Each structure stands twice: as C-alpha cells, then as structure tokens.
Amino acid sequence: MCQNLGKFEIVVSHYRRVKAMNVIVDLCVVPLGVGVSVGQYVAACQKVLAEAGLKHTMHAYGTNIEGDWDEVFAAVKACHEAVHALGAPRITSSMRFGTRTDRPQTMDEKVKSVETWLENS
C-alpha cells in the first residue's frame, strides 16, 4: 500500500523503526444501563489489568496504567470485553495518555517529581 502522504509518510516511516513504546494511561470505564453501582465492573477491569501483568493504580475516578503501548491498549480492549460480558449493554470510556521518547519515565517517577517540588517550595 504505497500512497503519497507527504509529511505524514515521513512520520510513519520514522516510527516504524521504533521497537517498543511505553505509555502511561489514565483510564475511566463507565458501564451504562446497569444502574448506579459499578463496583463489580471496575473490579472486572482491575482483574484484567492484573492478569495482563501491567502496573496499574486504581483511584477514585479511574485507573492509571503503564506499560508497552500494544499491551496497554490490548488490556483496555479486554476491559471492555469483560464489562460487556458482565451484562453492560453499553460502555463509555475516557482516556488520557502520554508517551515520551527522550527518556523512560514511570508513574511513580512522575508523582515523585511533583512531591519533590512540593517539598522544596
């Protein structure tokens, strides 16, 4: 499939050389049509993330996840599949995610960086 995509083609060909890309995701999965209590659905997604071997931290309105791009997004899909399997007819999810290529950085390092700024201010 060769198309003249101009600048985009250059970007795509550059990133094909990247072997792996880590990502940090903030994921919020909300099942619809299941009532107001969603704990069992959140628990199902947490199990999926644990079984995937991904580092994740649940918080009040979602879950932070870190790992290889393909593994993380495969787990997000598996979360949706698990929640649908529990009977949720519809799901809405929101994600914020970031990558960086200048150096590796974990969720813990990001938090520690801010804590250090707070301690020194």
Swiss-Prot record:
SUPFAM superfamilies: MTH1187/YkoF-like. Transmembrane segments: none annotated. It holds the Pfam family Thiamine_BP. Belongs to the UPF0045 family. NCBIfam families: MTH1187 family thiamine-binding protein. PANTHER family: UPF0045 PROTEIN ECM15. This is UPF0045 protein sll0230. The lineage of its organism: Bacteria, Bacillati, Cyanobacteriota, Cyanophyceae, Synechococcales.
